[in-house]
Amino acid sequence: MLKNVETKVSFLKGSSQTTLTGKFQGYDDVRYRVFAKSGQILKFNINSYGNLAYINIFAPGQKPGKDKPLFVGSTVGFSGEVTLPVDGDYIVQVYQMKKSAQRNRAVSFNLDLQILDNKK
């Protein structure tokens, strides 16, 4: 049975960044719910042993496994940023690619997240 753990991300008062650590195995994933406003920028950097962990970012109301991601990390890499289109709770999904998931690999990761105001 798949385990899909979802955790709400809270930033320390006065801070717009945090480092999250986690672990999952096989086809399981880890999901973080992050509130942000339209026009803000979500920056990320993910590190894992063997570079097995990737992220997808889903817009508010969209669900992993059901909807298309707003941002697909496996096509971009392990760090980047995305300008967010609407206010709401975004889901950051941490997962591994099918080839290593089939081998039931255990993946430990560190994920740096930062929310920035877009300076226009």
Feature map (PLM): residue ranges:
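C-terminal edge strands of extracellular/lumenal beta-sandwich accessory domains
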Residues: L2-S10, Y32, Y90-K120
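Transition segment at domain starts
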Residues: M1-D28
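Acidic, Ser/Thr/Pro-rich low-complexity intrinsically disordered segments
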Residues: K23-G88, Q93-M97
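N-terminal functional modules and adjacent low-complexity/disordered segments of proteins
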Residues: E6, T19, L52-A53, S108
